Regions:
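A short, flexible loop at the N-terminus of ABC-type nucleotide-binding domains that lies
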Residues: 2-5, 14-27, 58-65, 81-84, ...
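P-loop NTP-binding/switch modules centered on Walker-like glycine-rich loops
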Residues: 43, 57, 83, 173, ...
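Conserved ABC transporter NBD signature motif
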Residues: 65-76
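Conserved ABC ATPase "signature" region
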Residues: 75-76, 128-147, 256-257
Length: 328
């Protein structure tokens, strides 16, 4: 089996406050293979975006990586100096954020921004970098790229700006792309186009993609595998088809049961009672136990570790008695 592009092992991220230390990420592990799209889904506050920021080394103080290891194609990157990590960002790891305006300088033409990024990571002349920029704009679906390359960010629609950001993310042909809610601010029809674009680029370039979103519809359309996060932990991870059609963790079951369907014989939508706990008030044992209809005494005391169950891994005591093995 080939080495994964991204390998995260027992990652812990903490934020220090005046009164206590809050653990936003609590011992998660996962891999992403070459050309694979891993969707990371969960409610607001589950730790999805913090996980992505930890991978690219952008956890701001008072936050810090408190434990665990992150590997990019075998190279450990969580302990690199800020300068070394800066060289990796953009060249080996591309980033797509929710609001494209935060990634684009409104005072510069998009061509200038693309050319600067390309020349930062490749030894190309100004003319060659401009030709590369035009090719990238065409690849991400910008019409008339020879003309639009001289446009400013405000002259593009939201969907077209996001395409420009994607072009920036792939201009150095990175091994990994972190896409954090890349379709949230877009119309539904534009969302579908961006989803298809990210999936195609990952396949065509062999790029690993970590897609962070709260939208299971986006995950189902785009991802090969999905990790369901809850209170800084991975509740369940597995092939997206298996997790959607046969979720194992009670929280994952609730998420899938809350997705509307057009089927005439569909069951009533599931409502998960309560809300995700604050970081300062995560209960002992399984963090989902106060909201879980299947919780028993062990759930309130002992943290469940991931158990491999078929193609999925689930962190739930309900599956301890099943024929399975503890996930590495």
């Amino acid at each position: 089996m080939s080495e994964p592009v991204l390998s995260v092992r027992n990652l812990r991220v903490e934020f220090a406050t005046r009164h206590q230390v809050l653990r936003a990420i609590d011992g998660i592990s996962f891999d992403i293979a070459k050309g694979e799209v891993l969707g990371v889904v969960g409610e607001s506050g589950a730790g999805k975006s913090v996980t992505g920021l930890a991978v690219i080394g952008l956890i701001d103080r008072p936050g810090r990586i408190a434990g665990g290891e992150i590997y990019l194609s075998g190279l450990r990157i969580d302990n690199l100096s800020p300068e070394d990590m800066r060289r990796i960002r953009g060249k080996r790891i591309g980033m797509i954020f929710q609001d494209p305006l935060t990634s684009l300088n409104p005072l510069y033409r998009i061509g200038d921004q693309l050319v600067e990024t390309i020349r930062t990571h490749a030894s190309l002349s100004e003319a060659a970098a401009r030709r590369r920029a035009i090719d990238l704009l065409a690849e991400v679906g910008i019409p008339a790229p020879e003309k639009r390359i001289d446009s400013y960010p405000h002259e593009f629609s939201g969907g077209m700006r996001q395409r420009v950001v994607i072009a920036l993310a792939i201009c150095a042909e990175p091994e990994l792309i972190i896409a954090d809610e890349p379709t949230t601010a877009l119309d539904v029809s534009v969302q579908a186009q961006i989803i298809a674009l990210i999936k195609r680029l990952g396949r065509d370039h062999g790029t690993a993609v970590m897609l962070v979103t709260h939208d299971m519809g986006v995950i189902a359309e785009t991802s090969d595998r999905v990790a369901v996060m809850y209170s800084g932990r991975i509740a369940e991870i597995g092939p997206v088809r298996d997790v959607v059609q046969n979720p194992l963790h009670p929280y994952a079951k609730g998420l899938m049961g809350a997705i509307p369907t057009l089927a005439s014989d569909a069951a009533r939508l599931v409502q998960i009672p309560g809300s995700m706990p604050r970081l300062s008030a995560i209960p002992p044992g399984c963090p989902f136990n106060p909201r879980c209809a299947f919780a028993f005494d062990r759930c309130r005391i002992e943290r469940p570790e991931p158990i491999v169950h078929g193609t999925q891994a689930v962190a739930c005591h309900l599956y301890d008695a099943a024929p399975a093995e503890t996930a590495a």
